């Protein structure tokens, strides 16, 4: 007992208490930041495989992924927007971007882009980058590209007397006629399923006139260019170069191309893998890809695919942008291509041997320099559906080209009535 009645603590206990205080009373551990990501389909499953490297770079950021089926994604996003429950970062189909911009749901990305050294607009194919610019503002960064071009039987083309694929509509017409003469009445030159809009849309965007006029207020389907596209589309069926069937009547497009039921097929990059897997080894040398022919030379195609967007209500925009930059890097895009077969939107990624050395992908690389965005109005998916229905009636002879174009213009003008009303009052729809 010391003076004053207090008891001195043993030295070992004093040291222990000091250590405990140093551990327990020091600076708190950094708070874990959380980023929620929504992605669709196969991409939603694959993205998790890319994240370990991001976690190493940013250990204080937790990434939570929700995978959505494409069939339910659009409605779930709208429901989440209405309930103020949108994710931080999201994969968004390029034709959906105008709709969510109209809802004021997306965060403008121009300032983030200006500060970024990882995302360089000049490295992206111009047509796909442009799909994300609405009213002069950037709302997304392309994640992967989906476009359309020719898959064809080069052996049958050679038998018909042609050494190279077509570069113009006129050349393509001559090839289709020659193939039809070669294969007879039970087979065809090309398959253009009537329940798919892609082919007519590609032919239409190859024209100099836009599909909508007056800043998307009215249809422009009475234009000479659309008449030309629709007329050529109808001619392919009239001359029996294509069977008037839809995709449900073709049990297996890979086998049908393999057996020569048709020699040309317009499709997207996923079919590189499908034809490679499904055709037997002895037929692998018989097929190839080629860019779309155009009215007077190599033609444009659609700039489809998906982009990465940040929702305006996100509380973690800086962290979401870091993840967006990571997923947009050429190295990660290369790995993403290896896992999914999705085509990267950056030119620099295409220097990777997996892409540069892929004979079937080379035509896509050339085509990507000539892709065009579809009209940037929220109503576009409804419009393109109406276009497909009209085209089917023209093919079956229920409407002439002139009647079909006029009917479509009237229908589209009705669809765009609300847009005109809003624009007239200074509201951006």
State what each model feature region is:
Residues 269-284, 295-389, 423-429:
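C-terminal lobe and pocket-closing loops
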Residues 31-42, 61-66, 88-89, 188, ...:
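Short, well-ordered beta-strand elements
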Residues 79, 87-88, 117-156, 187-189, ...:
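A structural signal for short loop-to-beta-strand junctions that line the ligand-binding cleft
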């Amino acid at each position: 007992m010391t003076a004053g009645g207090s008891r001195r603590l043993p030295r070992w206990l004093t040291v222990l208490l000091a250590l405990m205080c140093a551990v327990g009373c020091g600076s708190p551990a950094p708070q874990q930041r959380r980023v929620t990501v929504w992605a669709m389909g196969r991409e939603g499953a694959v993205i998790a495989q890319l994240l370990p490297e991001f976690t190493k770079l940013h250990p204080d950021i937790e990434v939570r992924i929700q995978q959505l089926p494409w069939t339910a994604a659009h409605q779930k996003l709208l429901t989440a927007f209405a309930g103020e429950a949108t994710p931080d970062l999201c994969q968004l189909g390029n034709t959906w971007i105008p709709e969510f911009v109209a809802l004021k749901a997306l965060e403008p990305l121009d300032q983030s882009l200006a500060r970024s050294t990882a995302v360089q607009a000049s490295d992206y194919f111009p047509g796909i980058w442009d799909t994300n610019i609405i009213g002069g503002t950037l709302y997304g960064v392309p994640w992967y590209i989906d476009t359309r071009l020719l898959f064809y039987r080069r052996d049958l083309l050679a038998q018909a007397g042609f050494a190279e694929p077509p570069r113009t509509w006129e050349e393509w017409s001559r090839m289709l006629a020659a193939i039809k003469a070669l294969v007879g009445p039970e087979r065809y030159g090309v398959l253009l399923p009537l329940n798919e809009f892609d082919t007519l849309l590609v032919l239409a965007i190859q024209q100099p006139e836009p599909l909508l006029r007056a800043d998307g207020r009215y249809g422009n389907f009475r234009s000479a260019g659309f008449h030309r596209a629709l007329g050529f589309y109808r001619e392919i069926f009239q001359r029996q170069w294509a069977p008037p069937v839809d995709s449900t009547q073709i049990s297996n497009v890979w086998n049908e191309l393999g057996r020569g039921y048709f020699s040309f097929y317009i499709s997207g990059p996923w079919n590189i893998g499908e034809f490679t897997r499904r055709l037997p080894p002895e037929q692998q040398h018989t097929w190839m890809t080629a860019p779309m022919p155009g009215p007077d030379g190599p033609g444009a195609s659609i700039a489809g695919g998906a982009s990465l967007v940040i929702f305006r209500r996100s509380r973690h925009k800086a962290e979401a942008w870091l993840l967006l930059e990571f997923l947009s890097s050429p190295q990660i895009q290369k790995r993403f291509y290896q896992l999914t077969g999705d085509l990267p939107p950056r030119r620099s990624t295409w220097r990777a041997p997996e892409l540069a050395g892929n004979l079937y992908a080379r035509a896509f690389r050339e085509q990507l320099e000539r892709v065009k965005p579809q009209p940037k109005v929220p109503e576009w998916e409804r419009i393109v559906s109406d276009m497909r229905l009209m085209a089917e009636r023209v093919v079956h002879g229920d409407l002439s080209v002139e009647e079909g174009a006029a009917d479509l213009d009237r229908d589209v003008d009705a669809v765009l009535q609300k847009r005109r009303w809003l624009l007239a009052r200074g509201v951006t729809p």
